[in-house]
Amino acid sequence: DSALPAYVNLPRSLSFGKAAYLGASYNPFSPESDPNSDGFQVRNLKLPARVDLARLGRRRDLLGSLDLIRRDLDLDGDIKGLDSFYRDGLEMVTNDKAIKAFDINREDNKVRESYGRNDLGQSCLLARRLVEAGVTFVAIQAGGGWDTHGDNFKQLKDNLLPKYDQAVAALVQDLHDRGMDEDVLVISFGEFGRTPKINAGSGRDHWPGAMSVLYAGG
């Protein structure tokens, strides 16, 4: 569905997890905003007030003409890779499907509370909305603080795990209640594990030899 991005990164884009040599058309779309914040909205999904569809069409035609200039210099295919990226972007701003999918305020307040009123909880809820609308892949950054080289146990107990447990449990339950659990695979993991040995600062260091992965549904 070209009215929706195939790959969304929540809540913000990262320095990694992008398309690299595959080209810009495979990069994730990101709202670059916390869905738990007041007045959350995704920028540039609506046309400016002074730009109607006819004017947008003329701009698109002009851009297409300019893009044809010296295509022979595009040896790496960078410009060609942007073509589908632009086409999908135009489809998104001329169709209200993406606007509705990203409008988390359409959710009942009880549902929002069940996920947790924080960036992780609301990102998980927004991910469910996006998948339900037709987005095929959503990646969520669980926030900072997980690199617990110091004070590991207190950080996990008081801050990190309560938000994580609530958000992931609510997502899995919500998918099940909506009959989506057999079609949607939830995967939760970090890039490596933590050392079995506790260091002098009550922390656990990097341990690439073993890690845990949670799978649900799908």
Question: Can you annotate each of these PLM segments?
Answer:
Residues 1-218:
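Ligand-binding pockets and gating/stacking loops
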